[in-house]
UniProtKB/Swiss-Prot annotation:
It comes from Conus victoriae (Queen Victoria cone). Keywords: Cleavage on pair of basic residues, Disulfide bond, Ion channel impairing toxin, Knottin, Secreted, Signal, Toxin. This is Conotoxin Vc6.9. One of its GO terms (molecular function) is ion channel inhibitor activity. GO terms for cellular component: extracellular region. Disulfide bonds join 49-63, 56-67, 62-72. Expressed by the venom duct. The keyword Ligase does not apply.
Length: 76
């Protein structure tokens, strides 16, 4: 009976440790995604650049970095 109790305690500790490690991994993934979000927001929401078919004189003025003649074009 003592061996069974010890075995159950060890199993409970291992399961709780595994659950804690999974939770930390999931939080790390969430942090990774949240770090990427501002760069996308800066590019499209904060504007500061001209969208597709807007007038431009240089590549740097376009959100796509592609000024063709006098308007912003797609990336390719």
């Amino acid at each position: 009976m003592e061996k069974l109790t010890i075995l159950l305690l060890v199993a409970a500790v291992l399961m709780s440790t595994q659950a804690l490690m999974q939770e930390q991994r999931q939080k790390a993934k969430i942090n990774l995604f949240s770090k990427r979000k501002p760069s996308a927001e800066r590019r499209w929401v904060d504007v500061g650049c001209t969208f597709l078919l807007g007038s431009c004189t240089a590549d740097a003025e376009c959100c796509s970095d592609n000024c063709v003649e006098t308007y912003c074009d797609l990336w390719w």
